[in-house]
Design a protein with these regions (language model features):
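Accessory terminal helices/loops
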Residues: 154-164, 173-218
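Conserved beta-strand hairpin/beta-sheet module of binuclear metal-dependent hydrolase folds
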Residues: 1-47, 120-130
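Active-site HxH/HxHxD metal-binding segment of metal-dependent hydrolases
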Residues: 26-27, 34-107
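Core dinuclear metal-dependent hydrolase active-site scaffold
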Residues: 17, 96-122, 158
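Active-site metal-binding loops of divalent metal-dependent hydrolases
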Residues: 32-34, 57, 81-82, 114-115, ...
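Histidine-centered catalytic micro-motifs
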Residues: 52-62, 109-116, 166-172
Length: 218
């Protein structure tokens, strides 16, 4: 059983549902940009939410929080340096996001650049990095600098090599086409694009890979 379910939202967002180790019918919801697809997934898979984890304040990642709270009285974890309605547990670097119902314990990293207070959750072999790191790319600099992005990516690159990376958007094909426009003879990019296209044709999200692979590709 996959420990993480993906819920497509909007045009290219991913909302993640993390299953409990000992209670796979319970889940934590990561970056619910809208509530409707989450509620549908919960019904379809007969899942019970126990927490919400937010990486940053952009509406396409938190727009569904308030509606979900109308259905479920959940703890909401989020960045301490950003205002997100509904957050009950503000977090910054070296804090822990502990979800006892799922037997999960996540560390928190401050990874500013895309937004000023962006955080990531890591642990249990997983990384939820919001809009900082993508397959073959990184997030746009809306509130930070290139130097901050480099520092944030360096933090992510230092995580264990076998960390599964869960990003906030389905961007790899566009990122790789851009890379090939700049370096048309880049065989690694060509091979990666072919793989990504095969994944998408099979309905698979391009979301989880080794942290070392993601950061080196990006």
């Amino acid at each position: 059983m996959d420990p993480v379910l993906h819920v497509p939202a909007f045009q290219d967002n991913y909302i993640w549902l993390i299953r409990g180790r000992r209670a796979p019918h319970k889940v934590a919801i990561v970056d619910p940009g809208e509530a409707a697809p989450v509620l549908a997934a919960l019904r379809t898979h007969k899942l019970t939410p126990v927490a919400i984890l937010c990486t940053h304040h952009h509406d396409d990642h938190v727009g569904g929080v308030e509606e979900l709270l109308e259905h479920f009285p959940l703890p909401v974890y989020g960045p301490a340096r950003e205002h997100i309605d509904g957050v009950s547990h503000p977090l910054s670097e070296d804090a822990r996001a502990v979800v006892p119902e799922l037997d999960l314990d996540f560390g928190v990293l401050d990874i500013p650049a895309h937004t000023a207070g962006h955080i990531a959750y890591h642990g249990n072999g997983m990384l939820f990095c919001g809009d900082t790191l993508f397959s073959a790319g990184c997030g746009r600099l809306f509130e930070g600098s290139a130097a901050q992005m480099a520092q944030s990516l360096a933090k992510l690159a230092a995580l264990p090599d076998d960390t599964a990376v869960y990003c906030g958007h389905e961007y790899p094909a566009a990122n790789l086409r851009f890379a090939l426009a700049v370096e048309p003879d880049n065989r690694a990019a060509q091979a990666h694009l072919t793989q990504v296209q095969a994944w998408r044709a099979a309905g698979r999200p391009c979301r989880a890979a080794a942290a070392s692979s993601f950061t080196s590709d990006s």
